[in-house]
UniProtKB/Swiss-Prot annotation:
EC number: 2.4.2.8
Keywords from the named record: Cytoplasm, Glycosyltransferase, Purine salvage, Transferase
Lineage, broadest ranks: Archaea, Methanobacteriati, Methanobacteriota, Methanomada group, Methanobacteria
Annotated GO CC locations: cytoplasm
Encoding gene (name): hpt
Name used for this protein in its record: Hypoxanthine/guanine phosphoribosyltransferase
Length: 193
C-alpha cells in the first residue's frame, strides 16, 4: 500500500536550507515529474482512511493545491486555496506563518463562519503553516472537521495538537537521516487517526 509514494520519498534528494534538511519530492515540490498515478494513490488512500466529510476542502499554496484538486475530484467536495498573495476581497483574512525555512503572509478567501472544512496540505514538519491557518480558521468560527497531510516530518504534528487540539492525520511519517529519507508507515487507526 502506498508503494508509489514510499518509493518516491526514498528516492528524494535532500538539500540543506540553512540548518533544515529539505527533501525534494513530487508530493511536496512538484519536482521532479509528478506522475498522475502517485497523486491518485495518495487521494485514494486519504479517502479510504479518513473519509473526508465537509462543505469545503481548504488547501495551502502551493503544494496543497494538487492534493486538494485530486481529492475534490474523488469526493465531489469543492476546494479553496489559502494563497500567498493578497487579493483584497471582502472578508479576506491575513495570516502570518513561520516554517523551518521561510516566513510570510497567507490570505484566506472564500471561507465563511460555520463552514465545515477539511484542511489538506502536503507535509507537516515544523507545524508553522498549519498553526497559523488553524488559528485563523478558529477565529473565523469555521468548523474544522479534519486536518490531513500526506507526510508527517519532524515534530510539527505534535506541536499542532498541543497548541490547537487538532490531530494532524498523515499517511506516512518521514525523517531525514544521514542525507536520506526514511519512510515509516502510519497504519490506519494509528497514532494520527
Amino acid at each position: 500500500m502506498l508503494d508509489k509514494l514510499k518509493e518516491s520519498l526514498r528516492n528524494s534528494p535532500v538539500i540543506k536550507k540553512g540548518e533544515y534538511d529539505y527533501f525534494v519530492n513530487p508530493v511536496t515540490d512538484g519536482i521532479p515529474l509528478t506522475e498522475p498515478e502517485l497523486l491518485e494513490e495518495v487521494a485514494e488512500e486519504i479517502v479510504r482512511r479518513f473519509r473526508p466529510e465537509a462543505d469545503k476542502i481548504i488547501c495551502i499554496e502551493a503544494m496543497g493545491i494538487h492534493h486538494a484538486t485530486v481529492l475534490s475530484l474523488k469526493t465531489g467536495i469543492p476546494f479553496v486555496v489559502v494563497r500567498k498573495r493578497r487579493y483584497g476581497l471582502p472578508g479576506e483574512v491575513a495570516v502570518h506563518q513561520m516554517t523551518g525555512y521561510s516566513e510570510g503572509e497567507l490570505y484566506i478567501n472564500g471561507v465563511d463562519s460555520g463552514d465545515r472544512v477539511v484542511v489538506i496540505d502536503d507535509v507537516v514538519s515544523t507545524g508553522g503553516t498549519l498553526l497559523a491557518v488553524l488559528e485563523a480558521l478558529r477565529e473565523m468560527d469555521v468548523d474544522v472537521r479534519d486536518v490531513i497531510t500526506v507526510i508527517d516530518k519532524g515534530e510539527g504534528s505534535r506541536v499542532v495538537r498541543e497548541r490547537t487540539g487538532f490531530t494532524v492525520k498523515s499517511l506516512v511519517k518521514v525523517d531525514v537521516i544521514d542525507g536520506r529519507v526514511k519512510v515509516e508507515d502510519i497504519p490506519a487507526g494509528g497514532p494520527h487517526d
